[in-house]
Amino acid sequence: MENVFDYEDIQLIPAKCIVNSRSECDTSVRLGGHTFKLPVVPANMQTIIDEKLAISLAENGYFYVMHRFEPETRIDFIKDMNARGLFSSISVGVKDEEYEFVRQLAEENLTPEYVTIDIAHGHSNAVIEMIQHLKKHLPDSFVIAGNVGTPEAVRELENAGADATKVGIGPGKVCITKIKTGFGTGGWQLAALRWCAKAASKPIIADGGIRTHGDIAKSIRFGATMVMIGSLFAGHEESPGQTIEKDGKLYKEYFGSASEFQKGEKKNVEGKKMHVAHKGSIKDTLIEMEQDLQSSISYAGGTKLNAIRNVDYVIVKNSIFNGDKY
């Protein structure tokens, strides 16, 4: 592996601008059978997404992935989304009951448009077998498989039938995999994304380590089609986490998917909990992300997201923040 770097080590280099206003730039992206307003998706975590927010995102032209931590609600969720004329996008694990769940969907003629196989270490036979099971019983579902961190994993999951792969092992803010296990892409997530994207023939979703809106543009530069984001989406009015008041300020809970708070027990814990300052409406954040990405496209010298993929970059090893807290 040559050139190991992360988001804060990279600056993209501007190309000649061809628009009069950034509002001329189009941030939309196609994934599966739909086109979405932004190449961004809130993480499929319990404190980030719930049914209500999923409906709102789908109605407004954004992608979402429902989490898998209330498995018994998934069938009703798919039916509800279908009744509303919206796309359904769910997560599954790889345990035996998930195989039964997929068979049940097929029997009831329920085909979610998107199914994400959501496992911490996605380069495994368990995931490959679940991809094959999904493709057999729900051939029309768009299958996203993850999470992975190597080109070999991307190739194997694609060959098994995955329609997209999700890249990122432990770079998230409430993920402590790197500390608990010594493994992962924390600290070099952007380089891992680049490495994986070179091997991919299907879309890649970058997952974890995004701390600023500029990191979305950097993810696209290095091969992501879609960018999954947790902490930047935590703490909004619409976020499912509990609201807490501390010293007159409002905060919301945000915890990792393998944390004891999510599991209800202290066993194989690879996530932690934090309190995030209350940020107002998620709609405002999505609009700001869109405007910032429009600016990124204008700096890239284009009118569409793809322009970002062609820009030059430099590696600034002392970090672009110069030690300042952003």
Curated annotation (Swiss-Prot):
It is an enzyme of class 1 (oxidoreductase). Pfam families: IMPDH. GO terms for biological process: purine nucleotide metabolic process. Signal peptide: none annotated. The active site is at 175 (thioimidate intermediate). SMART domains: IMPDH. It catalyses: IMP + NH4(+) + NADP(+) = GMP + NADPH + 2 H(+). One of its GO terms (cellular component) is GMP reductase complex. One of its GO terms (molecular function) is GMP reductase activity. Induction: Expression is regulated by PurR. Keywords: NADP, Oxidoreductase. InterPro entries: Aldolase_TIM, GMP_reductase, GuaC_type_2, IMP_DH/GMP_Rdtase_CS, IMP_DH_GMPRt. NADP(+) binds at residues 204-227. Its EC number is 1.7.1.7. PANTHER family: GMP REDUCTASE. Belongs to the IMPDH/GMPR family. GuaC type 2 subfamily. Catalyzes the irreversible NADPH-dependent deamination of GMP to IMP. It functions in the conversion of nucleobase, nucleoside and nucleotide derivatives of G to A nucleotides, and in maintaining the intracellular balance of A and G nucleotides. This is GMP reductase.
